[in-house]
């Protein structure tokens, strides 16, 4: 995004001193997010049970958004050098968590970038399908699918009661 602003300023002959303030305005606006109604409570429940990492192709800042306390790590494609669905960014996140990729559940809302990408990289995939879309890949099916983050937290509570002790370790 910064490079796009820089290019636009150069092409228009504008003052390049505007680059930093313009990017800061964009970045501040980018980090003003509206949470889904279930997101905060569910994220708190999940993070209390499991180590959670944020993996993003975007440039959101968990500190600015106010969610950093729920995540052990934040991995962004720009810093990593590759983006989802490339396997290396999923693998790097697993390494940061110290968890074998076969034991990591990647939760995402984009069928290809998140779920299929994670599964091709050797992780388990959970599709957060809030809009009721139809899965289109006949060769690969998500391990789990939920319409809300609360449903995932409920599933973890019901099926994985031993995980709370692991999260504290």
Label each region the model flagged.
Residues 1, 35, 86:
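Conserved donor sugar-nucleotide recognition element shared by glycan-biosynthetic enzymes
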Residues 8-12, 29, 77-78:
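Alpha-helix C-capping/helix-to-loop hinge sites
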Residues 14-16, 40, 44, 48-169:
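Asp-based, Mg2+/Mn2+-dependent phosphohydrolase catalytic module
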Residues 24-32:
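Surface-exposed cleft-lining segments at the edges of enzyme active sites
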Residues 1-24:
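A metal-dependent, Asp-based hydrolase signature
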Residues 32-38:
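Active-site periphery "cap/insert" segments of enzyme catalytic domains
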């Amino acid at each position: 995004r910064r490079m796009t602003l820089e290019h636009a300023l150069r092409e228009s002959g504008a003052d390049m001193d505007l680059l930093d303030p313009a990017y800061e305005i964009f970045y501040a606006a980018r980090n003003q997010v509206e949470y889904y109604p279930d997101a905060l409570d569910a994220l708190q429940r999940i993070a209390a049970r499991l180590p959670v990492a944020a993996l993003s192709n975007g440039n959101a800042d968990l500190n600015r958004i106010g969610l950093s306390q729920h995540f052990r790590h934040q991995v962004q494609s720009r810093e990593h050098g590759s983006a989802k669905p490339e396997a290396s960014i999923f693998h790097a996140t697993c390494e940061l968590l110290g968890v074998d990729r076969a034991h990591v559940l990647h939760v995402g809302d984009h069928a290809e970038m998140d779920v299929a990408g994670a599964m091709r990289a050797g992780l388990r995939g959970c599709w957060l399908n809030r809009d009721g879309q139809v899965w289109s890949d006949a060769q690969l099916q998500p391990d789990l699918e939920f319409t809300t983050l609360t449903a995932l937290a409920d599933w973890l509570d019901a099926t994985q009661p031993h995980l709370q002790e692991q999260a504290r370790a």
